[in-house]
């Protein structure tokens, strides 16, 4: 698997990085068992380097299946794996509550797939409000679990990974974390490579952790084009933010 080789490359380069994967990449479309077998191979490789794997969330048709696989990994003793939760889904608050019970590390994003109104908030203001609620839950969860921080080599993240380029969402998280007493290095902001580098640099200057999401492998361009095609709003987001470097 190319993903397994990615860990060798990260280690050889000495970069502060871990790996995110989509379960559709590793056999979920064939069967849950095939996917789980491949995922364990990846996690064992990550463990050999004391590294971490983040399972990306895809469209809502496989949300529950993705969470079930994460739970199966937990039952098998894997603790170097985390998940992504999408704020635009109605179910996300309940999912985060359960994930925090097991101290999972959670990346929170708004959500980029087109979903029906009975599954996801159709209005952006509602998505934003839910993002803030979910971010507060993760910050509180980090406090409850002893404020675990990023590992010294940057491979293992803290519990809250707040993936957003929205300054209002970032400001909310900063203010809320300070209010409840979560240290700056007990959460991280996450952004796409090349998007709002000015904001990334400013956050680092302020003492916050910033992780940059970099597509890798030979199929990065088709992946990028699919993400734009999945939802027309993605194109406007990319163009408007790319030129605000």
What are these regions (language model features)?
Residues 1-245:
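Positively charged, amphipathic and often flexible ligand-engagement surfaces
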């Amino acid at each position: 698997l190319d993903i397994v080789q990615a860990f060798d490359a990260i280690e050889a380069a000495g970069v502060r990085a871990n790996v995110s994967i989509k379960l559709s990449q590793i056999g979920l479309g064939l069967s849950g068992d095939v996917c789980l077998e491949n995922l364990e191979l990846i996690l064992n490789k990550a463990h050999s380097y004391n590294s971490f794997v983040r399972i990306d969330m895809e469209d809502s048709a496989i949300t529950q299946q993705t969470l079930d696989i994460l739970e199966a990994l937990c039952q098998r003793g894997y603790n170097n794996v985390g998940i992504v939760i999408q704020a635009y889904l109605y179910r996300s608050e309940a999912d985060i509550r359960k994930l925090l019970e097991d101290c999972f590390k959670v990346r929170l994003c708004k959500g980029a797939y087109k979903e029906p109104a009975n599954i996801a908030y159709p209005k952006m203001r509602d998505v934003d409000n839910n993002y803030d609620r979910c971010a507060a839950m993760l910050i509180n969860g980090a406090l409850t679990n002893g404020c675990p921080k990023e590992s010294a080599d940057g491979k293992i993240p803290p519990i809250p990974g707040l993936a957003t380029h929205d300054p209002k969402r970032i400001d909310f998280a900063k203010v809320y974390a300070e209010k409840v007493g979560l240290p700056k290095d007990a959460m991280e902001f996450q952004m796409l490579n090349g998007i709002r580098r000015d904001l990334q640099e400013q956050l680092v200057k302020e003492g916050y952790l910033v992780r940059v999401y970099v597509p890798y492998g030979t199929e990065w361009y088709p992946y990028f084009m699919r993400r734009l095609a999945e939802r027309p709003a993605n194109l406007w987001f990319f163009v408007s933010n790319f030129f605000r470097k």
